[in-house]
Amino acid sequence: MLNEIIEKLFYRNNPKSREEVKRRLKLVIAHDRADLNPEIIQAMRKDIIDVVSRYVEIDDTDSEFLLENNQRATSLVANLPIRRIKAKPTQDQED
């Protein structure tokens, strides 16, 4: 039912922009249901990037952090493009 309302409200001739609107709305709903404010999400993003960066070199300019919501749960999805695997652990990891 929610999808039908979204389609009626945001129908456009361009299916790509319609899909983008649906994706953004789902993201807003997931953020709202998870009760996470933008500051918390940014802090989580930084912490995740810091930990993953100990093991691999990532392209953080193209990284994505999304909250996805289905009827049962809200999930944090991190898409982190890997440039290369680090040969040795960084100093932080050894401590």
Swiss-Prot record:
InterPro entries membership: MinE, MinE_sf
Gene3D superfamilies: Cell division topological specificity factor MinE (3.30.1070.10)
The keyword Cell cycle belongs to this UniProt entry's keyword annotation: yes
Tree of life domain: Bacteria
UniProt-listed GO biological process terms: cell division; regulation of division septum assembly
Keywords attached to this entry: Cell cycle, Cell division
Intrachain S-S bonds: none
Cited NCBIfam families: minE
Family the entry assigns: Belongs to the MinE family.
Task performed by this protein: Prevents the cell division inhibition by proteins MinC and MinD at internal division sites while permitting inhibition at polar sites. This ensures cell division at the proper site by restricting the formation of a division septum at the midpoint of the long axis of the cell.
Protein name as it appears in the record: Cell division topological specificity factor
Lineage: Bacteria, Bacillati, Cyanobacteriota, Cyanophyceae, Oscillatoriophycideae
